[in-house]
Every structure is written in structure tokens, then in C-alpha cells.
Amino acid sequence: MKAITIKEILDSCNGNFSGAEENLNAKVTSIVTDSRQAKENSMFVAIKGEKVDGHKFVPMTYSQGAVCALVEEKVDCDIPQIVVESTLQAAKDIA
């Protein structure tokens, strides 16, 4: 994946940004939906499933080096977050 900034991601999915403005220039080099695959410079997409809500893993992805999370509801964590109505639709828009 070509590196893109959080700002570019934000613009492509029309989300609301939660975080320090200087984080908008951070580079994202991978996008993951499995929290175990989060690594430095990745963006975690939190997906609500029937049994598991990916939002509960957002803090863990931050500790693994993720620079941003795409969420449907703000999570109590220091990671910069892009809040959207549907993370699935936003992921499609970003692609």
C-alpha cells in the first residue's frame, strides 16, 4: 500500500477527526481489521460483529503502533480517531 496521511483518509471518507491536529500529517502504511495485525504506522478499522465489537480492541492497536483508528463511536483512548457512520462503508470509500 502506498503511504497516505490521516488527512487524506479523513477527506476520502468524510469522517470527523478526534485528536491533535498535528496528527493529521501522520503517514498510514497499512490498514488492518484484525487487531492482532496492527503494527507501526497502521490504521485499525473497528468493525462491530455479531459476537465481537472491534472497538474494544482499539487501545491494544494503539499500544502496538497503530497511528489511527477508524471507528463508529469514539473510544476512550489517546489514539487519533476518524469517526464515521459505518466503518465498512468508510473502508470501501478509502479503497
Where are these regions (language model features)?
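Short, basic phosphate-binding NTP loop
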Residues: 1-95
